[in-house]
Amino acid sequence: MKPFYSMSLVLFLVITLLPKPMFPQVATGTTGNVIRVGFIHCRDFQSAPITVGYRTSAAAASIAVDRLKRENLMSGWEFNFTIEFDDCVESEAAGMTVDLIEKHNVDVIIGPTMNQPTLAAFIVSNYFNRPIIAWGLVNAAQLDDFERFPNAGILSAGQRSLGVAIRAVLKRYEWSQFVYAYFTEEDTEKCVTMRNDLQQVVSYFGDIILAYSIQVADISNDGMIEALKKIQSRGRIIVTCMKDGIGLRRKWLLAAEEAGMIGDEYVYVFSDIKSKGYVVPLLGGGERPSWILSTGSDENDTRALKAFKQSIFICDMMGQGSIATNYTIFGQEIIARMKEAPYFCTKDCEGENFTVAATYAGQLHDAVYAYGVALDKMLKAGQIAQYRNATAFMRYFPQSFIGMSGNVTINEKGTRNPTLFLLALDENNNNTRMATIYVENMSATFNALYSDEGVMWASRKNNARPVDVPLCGFTGNLCPKSFVDEYLIWVIVAIVVLFLAITAAACGIYFSIQARRQEIERLNRLWQIPFIHLHQINSKQKGKGEHSVRSLQSGTSTLSSRTTVSFKTESRNFLFFSLQRESDYEPVVAKKHAYRPRLDDDKCTFMRSLRNLDQDNLNRFIGLCLDGPQMLSVWRFCSRGSIADVILKATIQMDNFFIYSLIKDMVHGLVFLHGSMVGYHGMLTSKCCLIDDRWQVKISNYGLQDLRSPEMYEKKDLLWSAPELLRAEDIKGSKEGDVYSLGIICAELITRKGVFNMEDRKEDPEEIIYLLKKGGLKSPRPDLEYDHTIEINPALLHLVRDCFTERPSERPSIETVRSQLRGMNSSRNDNLMDHVFNMLESYASSLEEEVSERTKELVEEKKKSDVLLYRMLPKTVADKLKLGQTVEPETFEQVTIFFSDVVQFTTLASKCTPLQVVNLLNDLYTIFDGIIEKHDVYKVETIGDGYLCVSGLPHRNGNEHVRQIALMSLAFLSSLQFFRVPHLPSERINLRIGMNCGSVVAGVVGLTMPRFCLFGDAVNTASRMESNGKPGKIHVSAEANRMLHLVGGFDTESRGEVIIKGKGVMETFWLTGQGTGAVSGARHVSAKKVSKKMDEIHRQETLKSDEQLSD
């Protein structure tokens, strides 16, 4: 073949000798509306019948005209065809072009179909400014030069589009560099042009590298192997260009296989415009695989197939890659219509080679159809007069439609935006389209047709995509050293460090587990209370945070109703202890549990969490005592008792705010409880709502549902339970049940009566529970009848009734109860403690006024106050205190201590008003004080109805102290014979007296209201003598008996051995009276006589005392 540029120069010289025609506005030489179309076909070229041959493609133009008519395009116009044959020779094509324009006066030229003839035709038509549209095998890059050929159209894919498509594939699979190998055998221009196009694309984008370009001039096996060896050291992605259909690809890949360059590392990229990929079209419509020679199969076919599987192919599928499904019918119509006008090809079109339409026949159809569409646009635009003017025509030529060669898009330059295809052999060796590549100018759109990229690399290990640069480089000398070789020392160090780290981690984990286990054991010990740490209250703890019983009795306020553990005795369900905490003692209450559950890990975790629950309105759970005779749950002791106690005693004047505050505290406790891991209380009663020193309600006995046993609850304890729980016999409870119980407790507070007012009901608890289980409209509920002197918010009454509604679903949640309570007292922010203080201040003020009136004379007269002070303290002590001097404690080696107590005073006081009690005691003590003044005895204090005296201090009197106390004791008993209670004349006062001798320490205690106090075991012994004595008798210790006999004049008799609390077994005596050796002048008094006279009274009081003790 001759070069294009030499041929173009010859054509230019020929054309310049021709006269340049003058183009009129209307086509000349035509009759009517006729479009003259000139065709330049290839008839006898060797491969023409398969691709663009006249006998297998020409009728496509007629089919296109028929389509224009069906679509009402160019209506009223006819098409006249003039056909010339250039036989794919450029000089013939140039001459035919001139002949068609000058001789036949055609309006447009369709063709030629080869590169060199098309170049000649473009040059001529450009000179005459006549439209020309090429198709078929036209793909030379020179023909895409818009500046050179602005008036020509091309319906086939251009060679330049291959470079853009190759870049798109490289970018898709992340290959940044490649090698280009090209063959010039029989077709020098195509591959050289493709090289130039690739270099232009690489330079334009700059994101890929053309690492090496090699021309394979020697196509022998050795020559190919030599070229491949050069490629091996420069790349693994090998783009190859060669002439199609002569077996070069097979030969090239077999040489690569022989050179060891067929494997997972290598990818051979074949690219061609005039190709169908891995198959070669044959005459008659057949195809043969590229790995099989045209001469037939041989022994290398299997090797060739394996090599072809390491390649991919970029081509246009000869214009049939995306054709319509009716292309077969289209091809059959072409063959049939070739025998009709205007072709009348009968004899020449016979034979097996002309039974199948040419592969590019669809492009001829699309070229004629595109020309008709453009003319129709000119017609409608009123530019039909310029239809032969190529410059005017090309403005209307860009368009898009679905043609017989697929989707056709003609750009502004008059060339078609091609659709290329990426092909690969699948597992079944089929020529498979893997992707479409739509090229538009210098850009390409890659659309994969697979869902899994692995199908692209099915012949490779793990279906893995190859890389453009091997791990070891192209020459193999860049392989990274093995980790062990390069870092052997570091590996050893790392192993040692790793071993040490693992060992340390294992040790850490072990010690962490051990520490965690020990921490859990420590936390478990916090709630597991040893029984040995629970102490009964005795005198040893009184000095460590506990007052004596007598001190509490004398110091207890009726308003405060405060008690300590010392007053509490064991009940059916509770025990009271002092919990030893190191050197301190804490008062606690222990609830008995008959059921001992198995404490697994979950229950132990729950107990730890339960102990950590801390809220102002929850009583603190201290723990469980598991090693005692009975399982006990230990709780903090609240000194003011429970709400039930407050209601029962009725000593507190509760107003609206007082009731509201107690209810609010209960609600806050339940809100916290319902939101905690405990969930609900289950057995909420007024007995387990305790009140602490600050008048704050604390809910107790929660969270131990698993320890509850039905037999531990009396019928009366179930009166707070909701009806649904009673019916189900569920002692664990529910949140709704807690709300019901809350309503019952609120009713108790409002009415100031016990649960269901059982004191005034005829029914017993069992009957009430039966009615509650039965339910219905007459199911019993507490009557909310309250003292109307107290202002109760009506909304509170409604809320309480809602709480003990029969249906659980209709009861308000505890959150709802809290929000409604807030609305009832939104204006007040006082707390209950402040309220109680205000009440106490008011009470104190009234008392102060009363005392002020009664003690006016004492205030007015200083002497009387001194007298009173001397009566309260010894004169020597009082004088020192008045002078501001410190009174040092003093030890008295031998004194006699006297204790007395009015028998059955509590019963007697219950029959009197407070004022009568005061008058009674005043009258009695006045008599006693008069007796004391006659003896050398110092009155230490009165403790309620008790009397404490001592002789032998503050003035020592040798052994006379025991005589003075004995005479005073006999005088006390004697004086009771004539004492009468004014308002109870039938009642008699009787005393229980105890005395003991020993050493004591005396001193003044306190700065505010100082008191002269006695300390020593002798005092406790005297107290035990009194408490273990009998009414109307003088109980004497062995030491006092010894001293009595020492001074003489008194009669005693042995009582025998008696068990004394805190002392053990002691022998004690009765002082029966005075003997013959008494001091002269002393009145003879017999304790026996006094006792005999009061024997009946004593017997009655003893019976009453026994009844109260049993209670």
Curated annotation (Swiss-Prot):
Residues 25-488 are extracellular. Glycans are attached at residues 80, 300, 326, 353, 389, 407, 430, 441. Expressed asymmetrically in ASE left (ASEL) sensory neuron. Expressed in excretory canal cell. Residues 1-24 form the signal peptide. ATP binds at residues 542-550, 568. Residues 510-1111 are cytoplasmic. InterPro entries: A/G_cyclase (IPR001054), A/G_cyclase_CS (IPR018297), ANF_lig-bd_rcpt (IPR001828), Cyclic_nucleotide_synthase (IPR050401), HNOB_dom_associated (IPR011645), Kinase-like_dom_sf (IPR011009), Nucleotide_cyclase (IPR029787), Peripla_BP_I (IPR028082). Its main location: membrane. It catalyses: GTP = 3',5'-cyclic GMP + diphosphate. The chain crosses the membrane at residues 489-509. Gene3D superfamilies: 3.40.50.2300, Nucleotide cyclase, Transferase(Phosphotransferase) domain 1. GO terms for cellular component: cilium; plasma membrane. It holds the Pfam family PK_Tyr_Ser-Thr. PROSITE patterns: GUANYLATE_CYCLASE_1, GUANYLATE_CYCLASE_2, PROTEIN_KINASE_DOM. It is found in: Cell membrane. Residues 896-1026 form the Guanylate cyclase domain. The keyword Zinc does not apply. The keyword Ligase does not apply. This is Receptor-type guanylate cyclase gcy-7. It comes from Caenorhabditis elegans. The lineage of its organism: Eukaryota, Metazoa, Ecdysozoa, Nematoda, Chromadorea.
